């Protein structure tokens, strides 16, 4: 990192979303110096997630434009503001959309990985002081996104929204731990706490669903049923540890429902099911496929604005449980190091999710990759921005 840039604005290339349903504009912006309790990061690698596409689609009620999207990113700290003690210039880091201040009632409860420190301002697309660090060539302010904004050569985040990692961990893989991989893996290990011999079903087998599958396999689940309407996902599901694959459009008997199919396959239902689709009908199916008396269904997928879930109360009265999971229940600053170690020793697959690589200037094509049945993650390299 150059000392010449410390404390000064930096001009760099970013992908700006000016409006919903429009291509991102790859252009030069100005990134202000970090203020107190803020960190400026040179993003080395970033990936495109369905959440970015969801906001760009205009369906996100918290979506604000213009903004710099991106929340799966890793890089190197360029400079820090006053009173930052957790990271320093030169550190290899991952940006965190789920902050961890360690002081709020959420962090001190021991019950959740949610944090209240920056939630209000993060949802408004600004830094904790209510202002933005991004400006376009016309001097117009640009909103932040999920406290990360990794679709920029440089970004500024709150010091509670970044974690230093082992510099030996390759950043192109590490960036995926900023969302999808951690979300699914953590949901299996922390939220559900899958145990040896448990039966598991995963609805939706993208990066999050496959990460649930590998977490369940690591814990020794006896049956892991992957459910997806895209047969191209079958090979990935097997690779990450699924024992069975069901395509609801092809593998059900006449008039049979997916719930009936799963109950038939598991002698009464599953110990754990995971919804990774965001489809509220599938959320209901996932719950009702759980075993009476103890089955738990974990909701990971984010539904569209205004959507509601429903089931017959008897499903819950008879012992089934609905739970939610954000970022896999993982506390980003205190527990990310453990995930990095799992990756380094081979217990957690990460690089296997990188099916596509592109230079940053092809970011709009990377969004198109998401709709390709063969794509799990497209990783963009910052050095190839210009």
Swiss-Prot record:
Mutant lacking the gene: phenotype: Accumulation of S-nitrosylated proteins.
Any one biological process term the GO annotation gives: formaldehyde catabolic process
Needed co-factor(s): Zn(2+)
Keywords attached to this entry: Acetylation, Cytoplasm, Metal-binding, Mitochondrion, NAD, Oxidoreductase, Zinc
Binding site for Zn(2+) 2: 101, 104, 107, 115
Organism lineage: Eukaryota, Fungi, Dikarya, Ascomycota, Saccharomycotina
Name of this protein: S-(hydroxymethyl)glutathione dehydrogenase
Annotated Zn(2+) 1 binding sites: 49, 71-72, 179
Family: Belongs to the zinc-containing alcohol dehydrogenase family. Class-III subfamily.
Catalysed reactions, as listed in the record: a primary alcohol + NAD(+) = an aldehyde + NADH + H(+); a secondary alcohol + NAD(+) = a ketone + NADH + H(+); S-(hydroxymethyl)glutathione + NADP(+) = S-formylglutathione + NADPH + H(+); S-(hydroxymethyl)glutathione + NAD(+) = S-formylglutathione + NADH + H(+)
Record keyword Metal-binding present: yes
Other notes: Requires GSH for oxidation of formaldehyde or of methylglyoxal, while oxidation of long-chain alcohols is independent of GSH and enzyme activity improves with chain length.
């Amino acid at each position: 990192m150059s000392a010449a840039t410390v404390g000064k604005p930096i001009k760099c290339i970013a992908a700006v979303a000016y409006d919903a349903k429009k291509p991102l504009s790859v252009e030069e912006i100005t990134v202000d110096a970090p203020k107190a309790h803020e960190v400026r990061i040179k993003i080395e690698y970033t990936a495109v997630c369905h959440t970015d596409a969801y906001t760009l689609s205009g369906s996100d009620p918290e979506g604000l434009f213009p903004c710099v999207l991106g929340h799966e990113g890793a890089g190197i700290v360029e400079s820090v503001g006053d009173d930052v003690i957790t990271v320093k210039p030169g550190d290899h880091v991952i940006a965190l959309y789920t902050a961890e201040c360690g002081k709020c009632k959420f962090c001190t409860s021991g019950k959740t990985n949610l944090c209240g420190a920056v939630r209000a301002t993060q949802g408004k697309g600004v830094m904790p002081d209510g202002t933005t660090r991004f400006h376009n060539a016309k001097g117009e302010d640009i909103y932040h996104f999920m406290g990360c904004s990794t679709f920029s050569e440089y970004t500024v985040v709150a010091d509670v929204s970044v974690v230093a990692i082992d510099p030996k961990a390759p950043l192109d893989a590490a960036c995926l731990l900023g969302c999808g991989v951690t979300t699914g893996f953590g949901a299996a290990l922390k939220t559900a706490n899958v145990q040896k011999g448990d039966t598991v079903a995963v609805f939706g087998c993208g990066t999050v669903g496959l990460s649930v599958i590998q977490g369940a396999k690591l814990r020794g689940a006896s049956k892991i049923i992957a459910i997806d309407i895209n047969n191209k996902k079958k090979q990935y599901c097997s690779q990450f540890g699924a024992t069975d694959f069901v395509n609801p459009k092809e593998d059900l008997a006449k008039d049979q429902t997916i719930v009936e199919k799963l109950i038939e396959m598991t002698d009464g239902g599953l110990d754990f099911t995971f919804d990774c689709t965001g489809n509220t009908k599938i959320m209901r199916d996932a719950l009702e496929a759980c075993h009476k008396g103890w089955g738990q269904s974990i909701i990971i997928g984010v539904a569209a604005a205004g959507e509601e879930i429903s089931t017959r109360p008897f499903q819950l009265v008879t012992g089934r449980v609905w739970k939610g999971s954000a970022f896999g229940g993982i506390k980003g600053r205190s527990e990310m190091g453990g995930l990095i170690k799992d990756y380094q020793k081979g217990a957690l697959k990460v690089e296997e999710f990188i099916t596509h690589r592109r230079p940053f200037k092809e970011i709009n094509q990377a969004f198109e990759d998401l709709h390709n049945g063969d794509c799990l993650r497209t990783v963009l390299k910052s050095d190839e921005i210009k």
